[in-house]
Amino acid sequence: MKQILQNLSNGETSLIDVPCPKNIKSNILIATTTTVVSAGTERMLIDFGKANLLSKAKKQPDKVKMVLNKVITDGLMTTVDAVRSKLDQPLPLGYCNAGVILESNVDGFEPGDRVVSNGNHAEVVRVPKNLCVKIPDNVDDESASFTVLGAIGLQGIRLIQPTMGECFVVTGLGLIGLLCVQMLRANGCRVLGIDFDSKKCELAQQ
């Protein structure tokens, strides 16, 4: 099957042939019909991969501390080999997937069901049952594939527990930011959206 993978050492992405995953307990095997490319997260990963080692270190100070601790415990060369090995591991891209179930080891999900999940950009994906939900008959796959992005915003909103009439500022009016604005408004909140990009601000006002 085909899958999009990224090389973290240089940021290059490739569409390659990989073995089809086998299903396991409490998981669902899905034939992909559509996926969403996240302009924020996935572009950030590609930019991170293209950066030199110093820039990568600056972007992940917590990982630098882990590497320094490993140097102390395991030695410099062992640590260098481990870092290079990690950067050379292909990274699957994508986390917004819609498709049709091929195999299911989970009650409530049957082969042929249309579902949305956090699966990668691949022809076939395997996901745990808690990261998969059925698509209603009146929703097409393309629209449903945006569900995960909405869920990310919704989780943030649940954490702040908004109440009717409260005022909130949403900083960043990308797709998730726009979804947060709409969900907060639907919850009866007053919302101010902020973004450096005037085009995104104009879109938010439509």
Model-found features: residue ranges?
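Glycine-rich beta-strand-centered segment in the early N-terminal region that forms part
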Residues: 21-36, 49-118
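Residue-level marker of beta-strand positions
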Residues: 34, 113-115, 124, 167, ...
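Predominant activation on well-ordered alpha-helical scaffold segments within soluble catalytic domains
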Residues: 98, 129, 154-158
